[in-house]
């Protein structure tokens, strides 16, 4: 997973 996914999730 990417940093963006971490923030969205």
Curated annotation (Swiss-Prot):
Keywords carried by this UniProt record: Mast cell degranulation, Secreted
Record's protein name: Venom protein HR-3
Job of this protein: Mast cell degranulating peptide.
Tissues in which the protein is found: Expressed by the venom gland.
Organism: Vespa orientalis (Oriental hornet)
Location(s), subcellular: Secreted
Any one annotated GO CC term: extracellular region
């Amino acid at each position: 997973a990417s940093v963006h996914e971490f923030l969205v999730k």
